Amino acid sequence: MNKDIPVNKKYLANKILTELRYNKRYMYNWVRWFGNTDKDSLKIREYLEAEIENVNYEIKDSRFDVENCFIDAVPLFKKISRSEHGLNKKNDDNPRKQEKNVISFTSENKINGEIEYNYFLLSDLKIMILGAIWVEVIGRELDNGQLSNDVYANRVSENTSSIFKPYFEAYSDFRDASFKEVKTLIENNRTGILVQTDLSKCFYSINIKELEDKIKKLLTASEVGENVIRLNDYVFSVLGKYNDLQTVKEYVEKLSSQKDQKILPIGFFPSNVLINIYLKELD
C-alpha cells in the first residue's frame, strides 16, 4: 500500500467529473459545488483541480477540518410501498394493478402507501474530494488485496477515466459468470439453482466501529505513513458526522433497534469500497 498520498489532480478531476456525469443523484451537489463558477467546462475543471490540490495539502498538514464542512442527508425518492390491506383488496386481483411502482396521475386517484426514500449525501466539494483521494490511495489497495474476483459490485476502476467500474459492466460480468457456472453444471449432469437477490438496505446496517477497526488493522499491517492514517481518520470522521445528523438518527431508529447500527452514506465514494470490505465474509 502507498506510504504517502500521491495524487494526480488532472486524473482525479477527470474521474470525479465522470462520476458526476453518469450519476444523476449528484445533481443537488452539482449546484452547491459549481453554482458559483462559469458554465464553461474548462473553468469547472480548473476549479476542481485547484480544490483537489488544496485538500491534498490540508490532509498532509493536518488542517482538514471535517467539523467545519457542510454535511447533510437529502431524501431521494425510491418507491411507494402499498399496504398489505391495499394489495389484498378485491379490485387489486389483476397483477398489473398490484404493481407497487406504477402510479396513475389522474385527479380522482390518491396515492395510497408509504413513500420510501434513499438518503443521499449532500456535502461541500471538499468532502467529495477527500473521499475520492481515499479511494485512490486506500480503497484501490483494499479492492485489489482484500476482494476476490467473485465480488462484482462497486469495484475500483483500473483506468484513468472513472473511480469505479461502471455498473452495467459489473452486472454483465456477474450475469455472464453465473450462467457460465450453470452451463458447466448442466454439461456435467449436475443439478444447480441460480438465486439472484438483493441485500436489502445493506448500507443502512453497518457497525462503523467494527469496520473502522478492521481498516486500521489492514493499514497498520501495510506499514503506511502518517498521512495515509490521517486520511483514513478524516473519512471515518465524515461517517461519524453523517450518522450524528438528526435525520439519519431518526431513520436508523425507524429501521432497527440495534444499538450499534449505523449508515454508510450513499453518494460518498469510500462507502462503495467499505461495504464490500464489510460484507467480505458473506461473499
Residue map of PLM features:
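Non-catalytic, polymerase-adjacent accessory regions of viral genome-replication enzymes
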Residues: 1-110, 114
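Conserved pre-motif C helix in the palm subdomain of viral-like polymerases
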Residues: 114-151, 200-203, 258-283
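Active-site-proximal segment of RNA-dependent polymerases
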Residues: 131, 135-207
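Charged, glycine/proline-rich intrinsically disordered loops and linkers
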Residues: 86-111, 159-177, 239-257
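Hydrophobic, Leu/Ile/Phe/Ala-enriched alpha-helical segments that form helix-helix packing faces
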Residues: 48-59, 63, 137-142, 182, ...
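Conserved polymerase palm-domain catalytic core
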Residues: 182-283
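Generic detection of long, well-ordered alpha-helical segments
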Residues: 38-49, 124, 128-131, 168, ...
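Catalytic micro-motifs at enzyme active sites that drive phosphoryl/nucleotidyl and oxygen chemistry
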Residues: 105-109, 117-123, 176-187
